[in-house]
């Protein structure tokens, strides 16, 4: 045991730390930079957008939404709009009615797998074999956006689903939710407002640092009393 403490964002790996003799384990999480960008009375530029690198699954997902009449404006590596800076990303989140958060982990939707032999190969070769909460979950609301995220385990530990952010389980549900929230702006804006407040009050990196420094102090005090 060479460390006073270890920090992980994956609560399911805590047991692995214990197996190698690590006693002081801090469960933390990704977060967002602080933001004061305006999110009330916004002039929207996009109905639906996505910011993140292109992947075969994400491309398939966006195309599936397009086949249902839903245009997604995509930004990032290998998308037509290309990369954007952090400042540009902030603005995109705030001027989009519905911000998609599409996972980049291995996907097993049979429709995606059967769409191309390459998709099957990518799945078999993929190293991202489980979905996790990532920084984007917190960045979208912190920067003033309404978030429609793919459900991943433990996301409900940080937001009240359906009241602060909204989650979908597959492309069919995503399409239904997009159409619903585009047609119900008052409900969407209420959820967005609650999500922004939660993210800015509890889920910035300043909050994370303060929390794990408190834990480290507790571990240090306990060891000093031994």
Please name every model-derived segment.
Residues 165-171, 180-185:
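Conserved acidic donor-binding segment of nucleotide-sugar-dependent glycosyltransferases
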Residues 1-161, 206, 219-223:
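Nucleotide-sugar donor-binding catalytic core of glycosyltransferases
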Residues 183-214:
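A charged, aromatic-enriched C-terminal amphipathic alpha-helix characteristic of glycosyltransferases
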Residues 91, 179-180, 197:
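Surface-exposed charged/polar residues within alpha-helices that form helix-capping/stabilizing sites
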Residues 182, 213-224:
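Short, hydrophobic alpha-helical segments
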Residues 132, 166, 200:
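Glycosyltransferase donor-binding loop in the core domain
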